[in-house]
Amino acid sequence: DQAMESKFMPTQDLSSANSKLIASIKFQDGCISYSTDESIWDSFYEMMERQWVNTSELPEEWEFDKFSVKDFKQFWIAIATLCFIHMIACLKSGAPGADVQEAVLIKSPTEFVQIIADKTELSTDSISAILKLLTYNSRLKNNDIVYQPFVEIDKDRLALAPHLILASRPERNLISLIHKLRDKSYFDLTNLREGIMQDEIDTVTGKIPNILVAKNKSLPGTLPDVDYAIWDKESNSILICELKWLVEADSTSEVFARVQDLEHGCSQVSDMLAYAQNQCSDFCNKVFGLAISDNLP
């Protein structure tokens, strides 16, 4: 029971918040309005927060260009709360068609920023940076609205369909978007992730006797770096590992992109292998720091 309570909001709290929300719904000049006071907001916010916690995979301390994963988490939970409240209000409004004409949130960028600033500890600069990143860019090749769900109607208005927030995988979409933008922070994150992968391999290789391990070693010319290499002294053989952090594909274009990433990685390994075979002593010296030996792999 305690485990279940840690994952889900008590039913009575959500039920009470839902009842208060429904009771507050009214129409002014044909537009829906409703309360988002603390007794309503906090209950739905906690539900959205628990959803994030139960599905999150990225370390909060990871930094992007102008914000961290922790900042993005606060932004997303707040905007998801707003979307959920708005969706419930439309469904329970009693208006024909569940008030479908009001289903899409339309506000100025300043209004969106202020709502999130009032409900979180984020600075307006961080909020604005995230909002700008998530605003749809039609010039971005093979873009998808799930990556950038805010749509600019004009310079003073942004439109947001709540289901694009509520039905998305925020961390995965964020990484995919940054990768698509070829942002420097993506490559920084890739290096961080590869470091985590190296640590995971270390937990295994650290238990194996008579091996040498090398990481992040540079090779001459245009050859790629060696991400991870293992020299087994008993069999006198070397394993070269090319580490790749690939975001799971969820569209045809991403499937092709992952195939290209894998082909590129295989090509890099092939180049390193050819160098190791043709210049074995030099390879061992550069990667493992060993002088020329008669007992080379």
Where are these regions (language model features)?
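Intrinsically disordered, low-complexity Ser/Thr/Pro/Gly-rich regulatory segments
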Residues: 1-297
